């Protein structure tokens, strides 16, 4: 199990990403636009750098919903490989069963 503080940190990052998503997108559009002047582009870069570091979506880490485990995460199920196997063995995942050949 991951530490509670790590789970809380990821939740805080998710809130920051949601809060600043529109602002980041607008600034990135100005930076990428060929129509914007160099001065406008530079101002947008400085404003983007002034935003909180954790407001970037790339800072988020996928974690297991049950344990908070960061590795072996399966995006389709939202679980780590270990918890997915346990749930599958109990028959809690519809249409999924252990391979046998």
UniProtKB/Swiss-Prot annotation:
PROSITE patterns named among the record's database cross-references: RIBOSOMAL_S14
GO BP field: translation
Q: Which UniProt keywords apply?
A: Ribonucleoprotein, Ribosomal protein, RNA-binding, rRNA-binding
Q: Which Pfam families match?
A: Ribosomal_S14
Which Gene Ontology cellular component terms are annotated? cytoplasm; small ribosomal subunit
Q: Where are the transmembrane segments?
A: none
Instruction: Enumerate the GO terms in the molecular function aspect.
Output: rRNA binding; structural constituent of ribosome
Among Gene3D superfamilies, the record links this protein to: 1.10.287.1480
Q: Does the keyword section mention Oxidoreductase?
A: no
Q: What superkingdom does the record give?
A: Bacteria
Keyword check for Ribosomal protein: yes
Q: What does this protein do?
A: Binds 16S rRNA, required for the assembly of 30S particles and may also be responsible for determining the conformation of the 16S rRNA at the A site.
How is the quaternary structure described?
Part of the 30S ribosomal subunit. Contacts proteins S3 and S10.
Family listed: Belongs to the universal ribosomal protein uS14 family.
What is the protein name for this chain? Answer: Small ribosomal subunit protein uS14
Q: Specify the species.
A: Shewanella sp. (strain ANA-3)
